Amino acid sequence: MTTPVPDGPGTLLLPVLPLRELCLFPEASLGLVVNRAPALKVVEIANRSGRRLLAVAQKEQAAAAAGHWDLHSVGTLAEITEVAPLEEGARRLELDGLRRARLLNVLGGDTQIAEVELLEEGDSGDEWGAAVEALARYLHAHADLRSFLDEQRRSKEPMAWVNLACQHLPITATARQRLLEASAAERCLKIGRGLDALLRKEKGD
């Protein structure tokens, strides 16, 4: 049985899974391959303790090992929904993003355990409507992406569409991280402007 996600602010102790060139948003899913020993240990610990972990992007993607200062300060509380064995001890994971979380303190050791603060999304205000309208315009020109996002959506939360767009649109990992760190209103504003800019570029305007 899955433990419910805590409501409101609060702190948790979670194993930390560093991400390379990837970012995970709440209400979105992410598939990735884990093959480094510390990361495999994180998966093992998470599987024994509620299948929850903090998925957080590395600042330097080429770093072989990621310490506290090598990680961005904001990541996502995630649940492991699937673990599949691969060759040479690697694992393929499926993660579901639950809530944004701020990295407060990392406890040392080969496997990092972090104290994290769960973050509130806040009020998206009028920017949410503008972002959804921009997403509708973009998806009107990309029926395949619209079908994909329909399949991926697993929440009726107002920010679900915006977070799915942040997760799956063709932008860089750095841009995704900036969106993850932004407040709900700022994220809506940025993704709305970005979607319209992408559409204009594709049309050659």
Range-by-range predicted roles:
Residues M1-D205:
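N-terminal low-complexity, acidic/polar interaction/targeting segments
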